[in-house]
Amino acid sequence: RGLAVNEIFTQANEKLCENNESGMFVTAWMGILDLATGKLQYANAGHNPPLLKRADGSFEYLKTRAGFVLGGMEGVRYRMGEITLTPGDRLFLYTDGVPEATNTENKLYGEDRLLTFMNQNTSVKAMELLPALKADIDKFVGEAPQFDDITMLIFDYKPQKGGSDMTTRKFPAKVDALSD
């Protein structure tokens, strides 16, 4: 078994801080999900908090400390959080381009509007929810130019018991390795 998520962030931070005279940094959220048990171990490096919807409830922000951005300062130690997902739970991750989308009146889409939208659409399938959210953001911003990316990921947890249907693939750290 490899490193824990917080250890990965600690090591990544040290590497990003090396020779970083320009002061560049990045936010990140990472989780490792055990598909059989639902155990999700995660760490947050200054990223937006994910939204979690339990199978029988509504979306809530995952209560977690944001942690410090990666590449911002040497010697930072990251904390690991852990939750257990149950069948039907849904997790939504997104970049800051979602809540920071700005309309022509210079108003932000915001975390509250995002939470409201998600809770008004709890029965919508995951594959349909992201395009609907993007359409809502586009309607909100209108013709206002945007300066940040919008990246979103959503999944519903469905337990996977071990066996032949389980696949583990390892890729080299090169984008072209993902071509197939």
Predicted feature locations:
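Conserved subregion of the PPM/PP2C metallophosphatase catalytic domain
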Residues: 1-173, 177-179
